[in-house]
Amino acid sequence: MAAFASALRVLPSPPAAVPRRLRSREQRQGCRSRRYSKVVAYYALTTPPYKLDALEPYISKRTVELHWGKHQQDYVDSLNKQLATSMFYGYTLEELIKEAYNNGNPLPEYNNAAQVWNHHFFWESMQPEGGGSPGRGVLQQIEKDFGSFTNFREEFIRSALSLLGSGWVWLVLKRKERKFSVVHTQNAISPLALGDIPLINLDLWEHAYYLDYKDDRRMYVTNFIDHLVSWDTVTLRMMRAEAFVNLGEPNIPVA
């Protein structure tokens, strides 16, 4: 699977005028004055890795069309508009999220950047005919950290239902403890900004499930775990994360 940032990033032409990673506040602020005669897209909306009706009957084609084609597109468009005059021009999306989170005082670019990333990660966390039992390595880690797969499943559902309002529920690898944990985050907050390594996420904003489930969030979450989650993808993410954790690398590619 290609790195997520590479999948989303669309470089303008000519890109050489601005360094990939701006290394000082002065350089970043100087970027604001740069203008091109042609409007360019810094990030593009990428399609889910399956047909739009492939998740039925658990998530309908109508929901995917609205969720991906309207809501996620709006986040992409809004982020591109912000970046036209932003100090974060030239950052990868993961770098942007970590920097714009600003130690818990998010800058204006943060919400749109995180939502673009969160959504792409969400689509790739699912597959047609998913669910079931994880592969051996992931299952062993789940059993070690939760006691059993059943305990993990119940904790994931409980965490999702305990979130008040909009947000996300995640399975993450805690970097320091090197253990799995289920967490939920409000609104656009991503574990990337908190130092955790995401492995699964589920969108808990109402637009993700209301057309199919109305207010029955429990059934939506249950169907995700039982029928949609891509354990194959989780295995790949875990292998990549473990390799980088073992090497002590701070910037871990997670998709």
Swiss-Prot record:
Fe cation binds at residues 67, 119, 203, 207. Transmembrane segments: none annotated. One of its GO terms (cellular component) is thylakoid. Residues 1-32 form a transit peptide. The keyword Cell division does not apply. Its EC number is 1.15.1.1. It is found in: Plastid, Chloroplast. InterPro entries: Mn/Fe_SOD (IPR001189), Mn/Fe_SOD_BS (IPR019833), Mn/Fe_SOD_C (IPR019832), Mn/Fe_SOD_N (IPR019831), Mn/Fe_SOD_N_sf (IPR036324), SOD_C_sf (IPR036314). It is an enzyme of class 1 (oxidoreductase). Its main location: plastid. SUPFAM superfamilies: Fe,Mn superoxide dismutase (SOD), C-terminal domain, Fe,Mn superoxide dismutase (SOD), N-terminal domain. Gene3D superfamilies: Fe,Mn superoxide dismutase (SOD) domain, Iron/manganese superoxide dismutase, C-terminal domain. Its cofactor is Fe cation. PROSITE patterns: SOD_MN (PS00088). This is Superoxide dismutase [Fe] 2, chloroplastic. It comes from Oryza sativa subsp. japonica (Rice).
